[in-house]
Regions:
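Repeated loop/turn-to-beta-strand initiation elements of outer-membrane beta-barrel proteins
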Residues: 31-35, 115-116
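Extracytoplasmic gating/loop element in the C-terminal half of outer-membrane beta-barrel translocons
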Residues: 41-124, 128-130
Length: 173
């Protein structure tokens, strides 16, 4: 029985992407400039390592669709403080597609004409957004995870990079 179980255990998925994609756009029209940076990773799988321990602390929203008896959910186990079935052991239950595409940076600027100014060489006003959008089906916090080589493809529940919007002014004398 043990040998049969060991044969069933195998590496099914890969944390390494099949391909990566990136796209940069720099556009200047009259006194306006636009810069867009994107990035994507496709074909990698992520193990939601943080979710296994949620059974002992907070409960995810998926607990509402848990197994409650015959004919109910086949994807969420029953709710229990004592896990007699060992439902939190590493398994494919916690693995999902980690493919994503991100709009990392968008910057729109306007360059003011300073030809007749005595002290200023250039003035540029800009609006910038970072980490604006992530397109993914991944249910975790962020499919782009931090971690070392030993944590490749394991989501430890780290907080994702924040979305920020800022306004700036460049002045050259």
């Amino acid at each position: 029985h043990l040998l049969r179980r060991q044969r069933q255990m195998c590496i099914r998925d890969s944390p390494f992407a099949d391909f990566y994609i990136g796209w940069n756009l720099n556009l200047n029209v009259y006194d306006f400039d636009l810069s867009v940076t994107t990035y994507g990773s496709f074909g990698n799988d992520i193990f939601r390592g943080y979710e296994r321990n949620l059974n002992y602390t907070n409960k995810p929203a998926s607990i509402l669709s848990r197994w409650t008896g015959p004919g109910t959910s086949n994807t969420e186990p029953r709710a229990s403080f004592v896990d007699g079935n060992n439902n939190i052991r590493p398994s494919t239950r916690y693995v999902e597609d980690g493919s994503y595409f991100k709009i990392r940076n968008v910057q729109l600027g306007y360059n003011f004409n300073m030809k007749n100014s005595g002290y200023l060489d250039a003035v540029r006003l800009y609006l910038q957004g970072k980490n604006l959008m992530t397109f993914t089906d991944y249910s975790g916090f962020d499919p782009e995870m931090s971690g070392g080589v030993l944590d490749t493809g394991i989501d430890r529940g780290n907080y994702p990079s924040p979305r920020t919007v800022s306004v700036g002014l460049n002045v050259k004398f």
